[in-house]
Regions:
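Active-site signature of alpha/beta-hydrolase-fold catalytic machinery across serine-
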Residues: 101-105
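C-terminal subdomain of alpha/beta-hydrolase-fold enzymes, centered on the catalytic histidine
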Residues: 151-295
Length: 295
């Protein structure tokens, strides 16, 4: 039986090298399968417009991205050699979200999915990301590691203060807030496309965690900080209320941490910061695999 192992798109350019090795490659070879790697709309060469103005980004959304894959699978099925082939989708990170959501939206087109490190619940104020990074430092390096990082933060803050006092005496690199905004305002960049998706569907804003972590100096890393970028890079209408409503819509549409899917393997690691938005998926008809770091 021919199994089509489909590596699914994420917020990046596709590359043939991903089809030449790894566990999916081995599974495809063992089952005489055929691997296909598709590219997400608005990334790599899969772009409908020459530039990414806010108006031109209106077709960048999860619903149409899923429909792209549905159309592609149907087209492949028109070929006699693939007509009766079951389809398995594989994805990691954001692509893991997409394979789970595809299984939910188009169950008749895919037999099963393998989702690795997928943050399937959208969240605006995502303090859990940096909290998990702190716990990973603590778990892998102990208190000594934490102390080293904290000791490094203090002189860096002092240097930053000194530079601020002498900024008018010399020419510095353009590290202003406006320069950061410009990064997401470039008409053709994956950074702009992905940030648009976070503003309009997912959130994932990695905000400052609770007091007592190595990230205490990042108190400025707030929801307001990220939303301000949304407004300045795209549109003033992308305010905090808009972002929260947009993320809630996606969670409502796909079930958040409890998607209605079957024949799914969900994989997360305990020091993976994204597990915070995906580990509770161990529900009916879903196999959850929890990978613990080695002491």
């Amino acid at each position: 039986m021919l199994a089509s192992l489909h590596r699914t798109w994420g917020e990046w350019n596709i590359a043939a090298g991903w089809l030449l090795g790894g566990n999916m490659f081995e599974m495809a070879r063992e089952n005489h399968g055929y691997q296909v790697y598709t590219e997400h709309r608005y990334y790599g060469e899969t772009v409908p417009y020459a530039n990414f103005t806010t108006e031109n980004l209106r077709f960048l959304n999860v619903d149409q991205a899923l429909a792209d894959l549905a159309y592609f699978i149907q087209a492949m099925k028109q070929q006699p050699r693939f007509a009766d082939s079951p389809v398995i989708l594989y994805g990691g990170s954001y692509a893991a979200n997409m394979v789970l959501w595809f299984k939910q939206r188009y169950p008749h087109l895919v037999l099963g999915t393998v989702a690795s490190s997928g943050p399937i619940k959208g969240q605006v104020d995502f303090t859990g990301y940096l909290e998990t990074v702190h716990e990973a430092f603590l778990s892998e390096g102990g208190e000594q590691c934490i102390d080293v990082i904290r000791q490094g933060n203090t002189p860096m803050e002092k240097i930053g203060g000194y530079i601020a006092q002498t900024a008018g005496l010399t020419t510095c690199w353009d590290m202003r807030y406006e320069a950061l905004i410009n990064t997401y305002s470039q008409p053709r960049s994956n950074s702009r496309a992905w940030y648009f998706q976070t503003c309009t569907e997912y959130g994932f804003f990695q905000t400052a965690p609770r007091i007592g972590t190595v990230f205490d100096p990042l108190v400025w890393l707030t929801v307001d900080f990220y939303v301000d970028i949304c407004k300045k890079a795209f549109s003033e209408r992308f305010d905090e209320e808009f972002v929260y409503d947009a993320v809630e819509r996606v969670n409502l549409a796909f079930g958040g941490l409890e998607p209605d899917v079957n024949n799914t393997i969900n994989i997360h690691g305990d020091i993976d910061p994204w597990h915070y938005l995906g580990t509770k998926i161990a529900a009916r008809r879903i196999v959850a695999s929890w990978l613990q770091s080695q002491e």
